[in-house]
Swiss-Prot record:
Residue span of motif 'HIGH' region: 33-43
Name of the protein: Glutamine--tRNA ligase
Gene3D superfamilies: Glutamyl-trna Synthetase, Domain 2, Glutamyl-tRNA Synthetase, Domain 3, HUPs, Ribosomal Protein L25, Chain P
Residues the entry annotates as binding ATP: 34-36, 40-46, 229, 259-260, 267-269
Locations listed in the record: Cytoplasm
Subunit-level organization: Monomer.
SUPFAM superfamilies listed in its UniProt record: Nucleotidylyl transferase (SSF52374), Ribosomal protein L25-like (SSF50715)
Amino acid sequence: MSNAEHSSNFIRNIIIDDLDSKKHDTIITRFPPEPNGYLHIGHAKSIVLNFELGKEFNGRTNLRFDDTNPTKEDTEYVESIKEDVHWLGYNWSELHFASNYFDEMYKRALLLIKKGKAYVCDLTPEEIKEYRGTLTEPGKESPYRNRSVEENLDLFERMRKGEFEDGSKVLRAKIDMSSPNINFRDPIIYRIAHASHHNTGDKWCIYPMYDFAHPLEDAIEGITHSICTLEFADHRPLYDWFVKECEMESVPRQIEFARLNITNTVMSKRKLKQLVDEGIVDGWDDPRMPTVAGLRRRGYTPKSIRNFCKAIGVAKADSTVDSQMLEHFIREDLQETAPRAMAVINPLKLVITNYPEGESEILEIENNPKDESAGKRAVTFSREVYIEREDFMENPPKKYFRLFPGNEVRLKGAYFVKCNEVIKDENGEVTEIHCTYDPETKSGTGFTGRKVKGTIHWVDANNCIPAEFRLYEPLILDDCEENEGKHFLEQINPNSLTICKGFIEPSAKDAKPQDKYQLFRHGYFNVDPNFTSDDNLVFNRIVSLKSSFKLK
């Protein structure tokens, strides 16, 4: 990592202190997603943080699937998560499944029972919630709290054998029902769920709860720094309690950092699933989605996402990042790498009446005006071209420097043309415009006889490729996913997707899915991997060319 990427953050400082004090010889971090959905940009922040810390300090970073809830998890999500981590540029040291530790967790639960630190409770879920109390009122002890060790061992074993129905019994830690930390009020550590598991099949019908499983998983793997988001700060004392009372040999340290919030972006996995289930988007990889799969399909590069995650830093307090900051980093990346091309997404035919019929010529246009070494490409030019419909106005306002009757503009890399006639259909719609060109004004000849204020792009109507262009706006209208109690579906932007049919220059004839282009005056585009076929070229606009956003 460069010095910029080594910018200080409190987690990095903790690790440095731990290594300097010889508390640890090496560090081991982990990324522990639950395989119940697709990863989003918030997960990417955690991936980048954990893997970059492991890399910087010559440590290790594991990928662990926290698969303790069989009813919501699927191998589809396991595979997509593995793909996303690899795509972001990281290789895990070890791959683990929490479910592979179920035997060990069961043994540790038995240990808690034998120590008088856990009991089987028959209260209903509603009663457990009622007995727990509130933040201002202490909880009440369960009438089953003082069962004997022998009875608890017997009941827990029978729970494992499948003798009881779902929800009829749970195993709870025996801690303190009057604790000011509500997480300490005898939390559930095992529940009954007669459900087939994607990894263990039907071996188990009892499953550990997150607060019990997670610290044990970290300890089993020898994780030194267990990095999670702020909502788990109140759970840290419970995390430490389970590590201690389960007598784990390794003692990991939980550290919390602020989760990522982005303007105009839903970050809740539940809400993202709702968008998919209700058909508001066309899947988890819809280019409007903040999922890693969606960003990839939109055209974001791994480098741009990594640089974004590094730039936002690591904080102890929640804040919201401007979505334009993410756009800044993809522009920065593609500015250097994306080939240029001209495309017309809302075409209007322009006929050059004094250009020889049936003839054409080859023009050379620079690939990158800011980089001479990028060279030039050949583009054909003939009597008929397409221009953008918005580049012509019959009755323009002041300071409109594009094409209108009697005005002259430069066609990018070609000639000056002057509008002489407007052709309309029976409804008064402009269908084509007729112009004359000045052969003396060819680009690159050094012509200085007169100047024009407008330059517009075009494609040769006789040598271009039909294409579909998908233009995106934020899916969510408000700055936050929740605003003054509104339901987030009320904030869906009805104009989040606009589909245009147009043309692109022939240099794109060999474009393949995920190829990226800078289309002159339009922005950066990615060839869509889902909808593109041999006879249908589809481009997703990643971002426009410019933004008012400034990186501080």
